[in-house]
A protein has these predicted regions:
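Structural motif
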Residues: 21-30, 148-160
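Mature extracytoplasmic or otherwise solvent-exposed domains
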Residues: 157-165, 183-185, 189-193, 197
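Solvent-exposed, conformationally flexible loop/turn segments
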Residues: 2-4, 38-49, 82-86, 117, ...
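Hydrophobic alpha-helical segments, especially N-terminal targeting/anchoring helices
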Residues: 22-23, 39, 73, 113, ...
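Short, tandemly repeated low-complexity microdomains enriched for cysteine and small residues
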Residues: 30-40, 68-74, 102-107, 159-177
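Acidic/polar residues at beta-strand termini and the immediately following turn/coil
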Residues: 24, 44, 152, 184-186, ...
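Conserved "repeat-terminator" motif of extracellular CCP/Sushi domains
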Residues: 1-22, 78-145, 149-151
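Surface-exposed interfaces of beta-sheet-rich extracellular modules
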Residues: 1, 50-82, 191-201
């Protein structure tokens, strides 16, 4: 080599790899979702932003809520210069839990009754919809008929004044309604209930 001449050195950027994972808040992979992998040269822009966004949109349509997404938040959205390890990005999602107010399935005019085809989560119109089977599986209201008898210790009926002001010894039939709140996992369809409480006595 002639030391009096300029020496031209071609520098080739290292090839880097980035992996985007889709997990729940505990770090477990979201079922049925593959990692998104990409390769590129150090300092060059990441290339899978659209694919990551598309996957998030699909999962929201399945009933997931987006918790966080750090894709491209480091290195100004570029591949890093560390060939010793892959760049890792994490998209965290959780299954949406929707409150279901009590409704009376025997009352066709109850405004709380879900309707087939309506989104389970009203704020996610593209998400999973109510089905007849799912609606029928809900039990948030029940009616109990009870009979009250007024008797003495010797077993004889006690005379009392009924609601119309008349004297009576007849048994009284009373209907009590109980309701309980429900929560449904929009992704799995799993339903959890609260405690039964009486609406009237």
């Amino acid at each position: 080599t002639d030391p009096t001449k300029n020496l031209e050195i071609n520098y080739e950027k290292d090839t880097q790899k980035a992996v985007t994972k889709f997990v729940d808040p505990s770090g477990n992979p979201i079922p049925g979702v593959n990692n998104i992998e990409e390769t590129g040269k150090s300092g060059e822009p990441l290339t899978k932003a659209t694919e990551v966004t598309t996957e998030i949109t699909k999962l929201i349509a399945k009933g997931y809520d987006l918790v966080s997404n750090n894709y491209g938040k480091d290195n100004n959205g570029n591949f890093d210069k560390d060939s010793g390890k892959d760049q890792e990005y994490t998209v965290v999602l959780t299954t949406h839990i929707q409150d279901v107010p009590p409704f009376d399935s025997t009352n066709p005019n109850d405004p709380n009754t879900p309707k087939p085809g309506q989104p389970i989560d009203p704020e996610n119109p593209t998400g999973p919809k109510w089905t007849e089977e799912l609606i029928k599986s809900l039990e948030t209201t029940k009616h109990v008929n009870r009979t009250i008898s007024y008797v003495k210790e010797d077993g004889n009926k006690v005379e009392y004044t009924d609601k119309d002001g008349n004297k009576s010894t007849a048994d009284v039939t009373d209907k009590v309604t109980f309701t309980r709140p429900a929560k449904i996992n929009v992704v799995t369809g799993t339903i959890e209930y609260g405690k039964w409480t009486p609406v009237n006595n």
